[in-house]
Amino acid sequence: MADHIAAYGSYLEQEKHASANTVSSYLRDLNQFRSWLLENGAADLRRIKTDTINEYLRYLERRGKSPATVTRSAASLKSFYGYMQASGVMKANPAKAVVTHRAERKYPEILTNKEVELFLEQPRCVDEKGFRDHAMLELLYATGIRVSELIGLNVTDVNLTAGFIRCSSRGKERIIPLYHGAVKALQDYIRDIRPRIIAAETETALFVNMNGERMSRQGFWKIIKHYQETAGIEKDITPHTLRHSFAAHLLENGADLRAIQEMLGHADISSTQIYTHVIQKQLKDIYNKAHPRA
């Protein structure tokens, strides 16, 4: 049973070019399902029927899991069993007929322009850490790249003369422009700071931790949370918040949806269209608060 799950994980990485977060999420859902099966005396993933999956989803609901979690678990099982069917391991997909309650759409958290300015001002350029953090945050908001893409950047991916970065992810490459402030922050960091903190001359990573090695997701998460606290911003800021804000602010200022899709690296335009709904919701909230008859 574990072998099938491991093979599916490899398929997601190598064939579907899924992100590390997506793979981790799907495998976590599948392993939780596997544990539940073992606890209930079912040991073979290949002998599962639709009724079994429905019972598992009801079990998640009884445990107080949110509709979004239950829906995601169902999606993970549908994807896994679709893979099992396509691989010839199973004749049919038992999860295909599963129907879940539609989860209430949760829109991404967006920072206002003032909140972004306040957040980007937090790193103090008085030492190596301050210069590095300033460059990272400016780059993140300038490009809207994912945190996995940020920490995966190499020095050779940056062209400051032309003012862009080259971002390779999920088997595709895209070119994203930089505004002047981000170029300046990167120039200062690459020229004056990075050479002093890298552990070895052979280090290729653009951003390194204070031990001189490539920055980790966990390390960057701590940096984000630290500056949220010092800025006194009440909204929950995650590494993805600046990505969401980047897209929403571009759209708000008239950018073409297809251009935003290209910069974000979305395979499907529907993923980008969520920001249209975010802007509409914000306008409606403003209207309801300000209009005397609303």
Task: Tell where the protein language model's regions lie, with residue ranges.
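Conserved catalytic core of the tyrosine transesterase superfamily
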Residues: 1-294
